[in-house]
């Protein structure tokens, strides 16, 4: 296995070669990949023709899969193409046809083109996301990633002091409001409860590397102790700072690419493609780490590892 660093100036991202992730992998390889994710935050695997079951198996090497629950989508179970272990970030309906231009599910999915961190709106947010390009757009549809560790490091000491104990509120309602969507008209009052805002720190520290990172997303709608307009502008300024070119990697998709990234240390967004005339079938699995026993790991090993994560 070889890893070529993508952005050497900030030690961000790596292209992994000489590995077939459709096969069984031993504990040493998984631990090496996990260590590289802590170090580089993002790994790209080329030419990995995965089935859904193979993607699930590979994902579970890194933690328990967080299912696509009612607080992640407005698609009902009967409207979903994929199992609930997947986040469907395609432009397709249950019949594998492009969602119509005026479909609320399409409008909701457009929120993925805003800068965000997966599942920051959950009490226990995501650790890793794994995105498999089953069919990709010929033009557009890239995914951009930014290194939130480097963005934090570049802040002034004064700004670091200001934000170190800040608490923000995350909800998909906040990000969709930025698109002009009125969720109260799209779903029922009972369903709205699934999107109750949750608190998150504005700065997180990786317990292994000890590096701090900004924890931002367009899902933020409030900051404790700030008036809402001030909070929105404050977050917008931080996002603008964090998405400078020197912190950014743009992934141009080839079919059968698999990209895995650390949501604790990065932020991302999808770019425009013609979703009425092209199919973009990308399937995401998302992991959390608090209940998973890795291959060749004892329960005592698990407890020790989780104390570090």
Where are these regions (language model features)?
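Hydrophobic alpha-helical segments, chiefly the membrane-spanning helices
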Residues: 302-309
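Conserved small/polar residues in nucleotide/adenosyl-binding loops
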Residues: 291-300
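Non-heme Fe(II) oxygenase catalytic core, chiefly the N-lobe of the double-stranded beta-helix
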Residues: 2-258, 263-290
